[in-house]
Amino acid sequence: MNQEKVLKTLLMPIVSEKMTMLSANNQYAFKVRMDSSKREIKAAVEILLGVNVENVTTLIVKGKKKIFKGRTGSRPNWKKAMVKVSAGQIIDVNRT
């Protein structure tokens, strides 16, 4: 896999109350590029964070409709990847 693509696949970890509860089950969420596949996401997490990935689930989050100065607009769609790592391994999202 192209090294540059690996570095650009993961955009940021998602830190929320729901994701904090899921981290007890070895699941973590990341905002990823829209054109990333599950194989690319798995490879990027394993290379960059040094953990073994068991499963990757992806979903598209639709952008919200917003009104700004009387005009209707929308925020862009984005892709979320939920990654399950092997038992006993953790990802420190504060460090990433």
From Swiss-Prot:
GO biological process: translation
Keyword Ribosomal protein among record annotations: yes
Entry keywords, A to Z: Ribonucleoprotein, Ribosomal protein, RNA-binding, rRNA-binding
UniProt GO molecular function: rRNA binding; structural constituent of ribosome
Keyword rRNA-binding: yes
Top-level taxon of origin: Bacteria
Pfam families from the UniProt entry: Ribosomal_L23
A GO cellular-component term linked to this record: ribosome
Transmembrane spans: none
Role this protein plays: One of the early assembly proteins it binds 23S rRNA. One of the proteins that surrounds the polypeptide exit tunnel on the outside of the ribosome. Forms the main docking site for trigger factor binding to the ribosome.
UniProt cross-references to NCBIfam families, sorted A to Z: PRK05738.1-3, PRK05738.2-4
Similarity comment: Belongs to the universal ribosomal protein uL23 family.
Self-association and partners: Part of the 50S ribosomal subunit. Contacts protein L29, and trigger factor when it is bound to the ribosome.
This protein's name: Large ribosomal subunit protein uL23
Lineage: Bacteria, Pseudomonadati, Pseudomonadota, Gammaproteobacteria, Candidatus Pseudothioglobaceae
Name of encoding gene: rplW
